[in-house]
Amino acid sequence: GPNGPEDNMDLELSGSPSQMPEISVSRKEMESKGLAVSNMLEWIGPWGISYTANITSDSTTGIGNWTAEQFILCLRKGKYGGAPEGRNLLPPMPWPNFAQMTDDELKAVFAYLESTKPIHNIVPQPQLPVLAMKK
């Protein structure tokens, strides 16, 4: 816009766009120094690359098919997809902060997210740290 970059509210809560260009940094240097960098949708650090999730009500790429119980488990235990066997949530998701919320508070957040406009957006999968990859 005329005042510089503006948020696109049509994409609110839909996570990191799959077609977004990657941040141009030396991942090896970032990881070896324990540094992190972000554009607020993609985070690069010692854990690799993590992307913001689609938490809209979209039933295929968001949380539209989740139950309140899955949502609560995700934020209480830090498990992706709200499944006990799911992978751990990655930085920068501050799930321990949400873990202290009551069931009623988490259900209220979930109810709000269920009411959002469904936005179909396939978020990229997280990437392992380059220092952990076999050469």
Regions found by a protein language model. Give the residues of each.
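Flexible coil segments in periplasmic/lumen-exposed cytochrome c-class electron-transfer proteins
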Residues: G1-S50, A68, Y80-K135
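Residues marking the start of alpha-helices
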Residues: S59-G62, N97
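Mid-length scaffold segments of soluble, non-membrane domains
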Residues: Y51-N54, T61-N65
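Short N-proximal segments of mature Sec-exported proteins
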Residues: N54-S57, C74
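Glycine-rich, acidic and aromatic/proline-enriched surface loops and short helix-turn segments
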Residues: L73-G81
